UniProtKB/Swiss-Prot annotation:
Name the UniProt record assigns to this protein: p-hydroxybenzoic acid efflux pump subunit AaeA
Pfam name, any one: CusB_dom_1
NCBIfam families in the cross-refs: PRK10559.1, RND_mfp
Organism: Escherichia coli O157:H7
Compartment(s) where it occurs, according to its Swiss-Prot or TrEMBL record: Cell inner membrane
Functional description taken from the UniProt entry: Forms an efflux pump with AaeB.
Gene Ontology annotations for the cellular component aspect, listed alphabetically: plasma membrane
InterPro entries: CusB-like_dom_1, CusB_D23, MFP_Efflux_Pump, PHBA_efflux_pump_AaeA, RND_pump_MFP
Protein encoded by which gene: aaeA
Domain of life: Bacteria
GO molecular-function terms, A-Z: transmembrane transporter activity
Transmembrane segments: 12-32
Membrane-related topology note: Single-pass membrane protein
């Protein structure tokens, strides 16, 4: 009898332990697969592609992949050519100003004399000549202003505080108008784009708190969900040349969850030393930050599993 009871007790204990282990593993798996988190996240920032508005030879490069202030000179394009163009335009303006003054006096004199001294045709001709010269003066002034603007834009300045990166221009090179010369990563503009699976969006709302762990680091950054993308492209549906819908074949028992971009605003920009484009793990903790002291062993294990799973 004792042997039977002992055997039954061992069996019962084994069954209970197996059930508890199954429950723990199941809860950890559900937490791992359904809680709002992703390892498909990247640091991003506002990047300005800087291109000159004029063409010419680069005469001076002032910066090399460094932090710059707004208005700081990045590089300079050949100025003498644009200086000469401005001087020529200024000379044209001066010429037409003198000519306009002469024609204005001539037209005024003929208008005062009237038809008693000359024909109406001669009076109208003088007025028409004056209007033509005034029109030419206006064009010359516009050309002068444009030449002045071109000269000013031979000096390319930083549009904002930030880091100059991917600088690929050198002194002596010829650069064309509109060609990207350098990228400027704006300071204090860093954020995280987390690509959440659609099955996890239930726990993601603007204003929710988030934890960001950069790849290869144990440091946890804090942030707030700023926005959730309103839509993503349907890659399985296109249109043919007649406008008819084309739907790709799909296996009914295999459905891959779509990923939706979630923008997360970092709490402290100054602590961010990770370049834009680097990856991270993001966990959305809800309306408040996660209290690690309240986490169970399995919850902590699930958090660690996210880094490797």
């Amino acid at each position: 009898m004792k042997t039977l009871i002992r055997k039954f007790s061992r069996t019962a204990i084994t069954v209970v332990l197996v059930i508890l282990a199954f429950i723990a593993i199941f809860n950890a798996w559900v937490y791992y697969t359904e809680s709002p988190w992703t390892r498909d996240a990247r640091f991003s920032a506002d990047v300005v592609a800087i291109a000159p508005d004029v063409s010419g030879l680069i005469t001076q490069v002032n910066v090399h992949n460094q932090l710059v202030k707004k208005g700081q000179v990045l590089f300079t394009i050949d100025q003498p050519r644009y200086q000469k163009a401005l001087e020529e335009a200024q000379a044209d303006v001066a010429y037409y100003q003198v000519l306009a003054q002469e024609k204005r006096q001539e037209a005024g004199r003929r208008n005062r004399l009237g038809v008693q001294a000359m024909s109406r045709e001669e009076i109208d001709q003088a007025n028409n000549v004056l209007q033509t010269v005034l029109h030419q003066l206006a064009k010359a002034q516009a050309t002068r202003d444009l030449a002045k603007l071109d000269l000013e834009r031979t000096v390319i300045r930083a549009p904002a505080d930030g880091w100059v990166t991917n600088l690929n221009v050198y002194t002596g090179e010829f650069i064309t108008r509109g060609s990207t010369a350098v990228a400027l990563v704006k300071q204090n503009s860093f954020y995280v784009l987390a690509y959440m699976e659609e099955t996890k969006l239930e726990g993601v709302r603007p204003g929710y708190r988030a934890e960001i762990t950069p790849l290869g680091s144990n440091k946890v950054l804090k942030g707030t969900v700023d926005s959730v993308a309103a839509g993503v492209t349907n890659a399985s549906s296109t249109r043919d040349d007649k406008g008819m819908a084309t739907i790709d074949s799909n296996l009914e028992w295999v459905r891959l969850a779509q990923r939706v971009p979630v923008r997360i605003r970092l709490d402290n920009q100054q602590e961010n030393i990770w370049p834009a484009g680097t990856t991270a793990t993001v966990v959305v903790t809800g309306k408040q930050d996660r209290d690690e002291s309240q986490d169970s062993f399995f919850r902590k294990m699930a958090h660690r599993l996210r880094e490797f799973g």
